[in-house]
């Protein structure tokens, strides 16, 4: 996969579609195809954004199981290829994704979960007057890294509760930005292998959850310019010593990524956007 961008482009992409000014000088550029597509639809500023972040669903497992990932592309048809970051472990990846900065700048370079002190996407959103919600499995990286900000945190027992809470937030329509995190595929990957039947079953459940969230977004946010994203953090490979799934090294199976984005114009109400 030939690409110079990393998952760090997520932060500036979200800010760009919201019309928020550039942040720190070291932040990675937005994904140009996403911003260009928004402008081609006449969307200068989105009013709502939902990002769904399933753990460890890399490019290669998507390529191996197109029938599984297919419903995601139907709901979010703009596919952007990119790299993860080294080492491709969850806290390093999500710290990069939601600061726009490399590990050398945000400071997380191994598997650890401190509260980040640098500027994050969520700080920029709040500064721009956006109402932010983060829904994640309790004590996961996303649940812990971005604490101590004026955002709404929802820590849930596991993926099904995350989905239900996220749907409730979308239907209530009181937040401009919602981040939703799932982890079952990664959990099973480590117990089995990235393409084991049990792991692919978890991947199917992630896809089904994304479809439910997309349907909720369409129902609740249909009058608003909006963006929907399927944004995993890294992939996985088989450890030759254990025969089980793992990740954390600079190998294509861990590093090659693709994200899925959907941008939609709001429906008009009496000639104006509600």
Regions found by a protein language model. Give the residues of each.
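Feature captures the catalytic ectodomains and active-site-proximal regions of enzymes
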Residues: 1-274
């Amino acid at each position: 996969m030939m690409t110079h961008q990393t998952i760090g482009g997520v932060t500036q992409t979200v800010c760009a579609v919201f019309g928020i000014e550039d942040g720190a000088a070291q932040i990675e550029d937005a994904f140009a195809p996403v911003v260009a597509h928004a402008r081609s639809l006449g969307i200068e500023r989105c009013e709502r954004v939902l990002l769904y972040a399933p753990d460890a669903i890399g490019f290669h497992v998507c390529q191996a199981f197109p029938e599984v990932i297919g419903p995601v592309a139907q709901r979010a048809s703009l596919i952007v290829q990119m790299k993860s970051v080294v080492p491709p472990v969850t806290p390093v990846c999500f710290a990069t994704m939601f600061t726009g900065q490399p590990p050398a700048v945000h400071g997380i370079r191994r598997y650890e979960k401190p509260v980040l002190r640098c500027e994050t996407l969520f700080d920029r959103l709040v500064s721009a007057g956006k109402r932010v919600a983060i829904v994640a499995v309790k004590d996961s990286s996303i649940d812990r890294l971005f604490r101590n900000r004026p955002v709404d945190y929802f820590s849930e027992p596991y993926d099904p509760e995350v989905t239900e809470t996220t749907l409730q937030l979308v239907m209530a329509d009181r937040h401009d930005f919602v981040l939703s995190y799932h982890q079952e595929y990664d959990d099973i990957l480590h117990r089995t292998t990235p393409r084991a039947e049990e792991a692919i079953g978890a991947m199917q459940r992630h896809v089904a959850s994304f479809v439910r969230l997309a349907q909720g977004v369409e129902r609740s946010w249909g009058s608003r310019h909006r963006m929907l994203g399927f944004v995993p953090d890294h992939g996985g490979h088989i450890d030759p010593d254990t025969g089980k799934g793992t990740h954390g090294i600079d190998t294509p199976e861990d590093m090659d990524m693709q994200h899925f984005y959907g941008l939609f114009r709001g429906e008009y109400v009496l000639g104006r956007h509600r």
